[in-house]
């Protein structure tokens, strides 16, 4: 297995992986999300963006996982320190390849991407119900930073 930056030629192989991530979200929070395919423009913008990348795990010529990253700059405010951090927007590994170090390799690649750009941190959001993901991130040394509350059925 190797980790590399995606190219436009990878778009078709990436579509089912992004769809798998969206499917997981829809299963965990069906009132908030629905299954869908990620549009090609979004995928290609991540690949070609000046402040973004899609990192892929490839095995035997097939993409088995992805990590979508982009830079976020927090503008200075009297109460806020200006900084740029890496947002890990999506990380997804095909089910057949989970628990084999693929996700950790992608997370490490995202971290290296952020460090190479001198980002202050690597941040992500995950659904509270996604216990597997939360365990994965905590085992990787990440910590919970913010909690979002929601009041539904208004």
Predicted regions span which residues?
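A short beta-loop-alpha structural element at the N-terminal edge
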Residues: 2-16
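Conserved GNAT-fold acetyl-CoA-binding loop/helix
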Residues: 22-43
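A short helix-loop-beta-strand connector motif used in the catalytic cores of GNAT acetyltransferases and
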Residues: 45-56, 87
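Conserved beta-strand in the GNAT
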Residues: 56, 62-71, 87, 92
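Conserved acetyl-CoA binding element of GNAT-fold acetyltransferases
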Residues: 79-95, 125, 147-150
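Conserved acetyl-CoA-binding loop-helix of GNAT-fold acetyltransferases
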Residues: 93, 99-112, 139
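Conserved active-site alpha-helix within GNAT-family acetyltransferase domains
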Residues: 104, 116, 128-146, 151
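Conserved GNAT acetyl-CoA-binding A-motif
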Residues: 114-125
């Amino acid at each position: 297995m190797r980790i590399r930056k995606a190219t436009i030629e990878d778009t078709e192989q990436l579509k089912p992986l992004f769809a798998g991530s969206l499917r997981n979200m829809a299963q965990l929070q069906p009132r908030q999300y629905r299954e869908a395919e990620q549009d090609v423009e979004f995928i290609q913008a991540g690949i070609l963006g000046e402040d973004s990348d899609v990192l892929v795990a490839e095995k035997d010529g097939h993409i088995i996982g992805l990590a979508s990253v982009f830079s976020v700059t927090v503008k200075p405010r009297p109460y806020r320190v200006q900084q740029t951090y890496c947002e890990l927007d999506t990380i997804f590994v095909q089910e057949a390849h989970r628990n084999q170090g693929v996700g950790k390799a992608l997370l490490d690649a995202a971290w290296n991407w952020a460090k190479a750009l001198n980002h202050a941190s690597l941040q992500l959001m995950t659904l509270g119900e996604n216990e597997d993901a939360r365990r994965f991130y905590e085992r990787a040394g990440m910590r919970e930073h913010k909690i979002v509350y929601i009041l539904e059925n208004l």
